[in-house]
Amino acid sequence: ELCRQIVHFNPSKLIMVDINENALYMLKQEFLVMKRKQQMNDSIQLESLIISIREREEIYKLMKSYKPDVVYHAAAHKHVPLMEDRPTEAIRNNIFGTKNVIDACCDCGISRFIMISTDKAVNPTNVMGATKRMTEMYMQSRNTKCKIHMAAVRFGNVLGSNGSVIPIFKEQIKNGGPVTVTHRDIKRYFMTIPEAAQLVLQAGFYANEREI
């Protein structure tokens, strides 16, 4: 969704990086169809790159080769129960992977870095939240030593996103139930996927140093 909204601002080039090859392929195909239907500026250059944020050398090559104006960092393991079972995976990916991206942005002179975080980073009570809080702290400490604009955007529940409660509820209902909830009196607050993407883009424009 973030890429879909970015193309409406007519960037000269959009570099889409993911470890999920199928998602990356399908997104590029969607954009090519939009170009053919003249729903998107045909002059926008599209690059699809399969790279893991854990591969420090590859991330540095990416930044040095393309020198992007803005980096939006959304890669993370976010499923709370799974990360409780595999905390080392959460640490390797969420902390050290993000560190690779931040370091590369600083060392390669990228102008802006925007990181997707979570409200679970506030007084974290689980592994996922703790890893995201550590990445926020690293971003803030690193930004004192490099002259680029950095910010983290904290999200709560994004309606319909992968791993969010609505797709889980739909699947449970489809399979005949039961529908599981944490507690019968719990309240959840949601934003839509387009609203979340707009917030990230606004943060990219207004972000100052070390803001969350």
Q: Where do the protein language model's features map onto the residues?
A:
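Aromatic pocket-lining residues of Rossmann-like dinucleotide-binding sites
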Residues: 2-6
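Proline-aspartate-enriched helix->loop->beta-strand connector
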Residues: 11-12, 63-72, 80, 110
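Helix N-cap at the beta1-alpha1 junction of Rossmann-like dinucleotide-binding domains, i.e.
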Residues: 19-23, 53
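NAD(P)-dependent short-chain dehydrogenase/reductase
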Residues: 32, 103-106, 127-211
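Conserved Rossmann-fold cofactor-binding substructure of NAD(P)-dependent oxidoreductases
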Residues: 47-70
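Conserved beta-strand scaffold in the Rossmann-like NAD(H)/NADP(H)-binding core
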Residues: 48, 115, 152-154
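Conserved residues in the N-terminal Rossmann fold of short-chain dehydrogenase/reductase
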Residues: 49-50, 92, 183
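Conserved Rossmann-fold NAD(P)-dependent oxidoreductase catalytic core, especially the SDR/UDP-sugar
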Residues: 73, 77-136, 141-143, 150
